[in-house]
């Protein structure tokens, strides 16, 4: 995929990755190569690749079906990493990833694949810009910044603390 992008900047490659991000480790060398292309070419080239991986826990999958790998992969400059929380985020970020220049690691939270609480209306041709957070719950006492399926855990905690203590927690 990295080499194929070199022929034409209009080529965008989407790689449907492993069923579980846990199985991505043997391919991490290729990931590293893609993250280095921009720096290696002095800004002349960046691979237009979107790599999709199912990631995360909370599905009862055990040791090799619950890993969250973004922490290790964010230490390598040269890739954007996105991790949606709701259906509109998922659709919008995937469209933006596929249409943008550069390398994007698109992590899909497995726990939300069939989660009713993550379902939202998705407008046609909807995109979510990179680097723009969404306030999912307004509040004034404390701000929680989160992503992926833990957004839903934080929303539940915010609601509980509001009912029990009257605290207004913002969830971004």
Predicted stretch roles:
Residues 2-145, 149-153, 159, 169-170:
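Conserved thiamine diphosphate
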């Amino acid at each position: 995929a990295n080499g194929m992008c070199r022929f034409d900047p209009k080529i965008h490659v989407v790689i449907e990755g492993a069923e579980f991000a846990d199985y991505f480790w043997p391919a991490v060398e290729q990931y590293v190569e893609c993250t280095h292309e921009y720096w290696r070419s002095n800004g002349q080239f960046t691979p237009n690749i979107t790599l999709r991986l199912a990631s995360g826990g909370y599905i009862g999958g055990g040791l090799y079906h619950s890993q969250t790998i973004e922490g290790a992969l964010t230490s390598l400059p040269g890739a954007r990493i996105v991790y949606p929380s709701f259906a509109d985020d998922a659709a919008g970020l995937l469209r933006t990833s596929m249409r943008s220049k550069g390398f994007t690691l698109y992590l899909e939270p497995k726990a939300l694949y069939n989660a009713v609480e993550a379902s939202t209306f998705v407008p046609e041709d909807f995109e979510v810009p990179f680097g723009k957070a969404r306030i999912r719950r307004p509040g004034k006492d404390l701000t929680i910044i989160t992503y992926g399926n833990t957004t839903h855990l934080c929303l539940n905690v915010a609601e509980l603390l509001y009912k029990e203590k009257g605290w207004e927690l913002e969830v971004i």
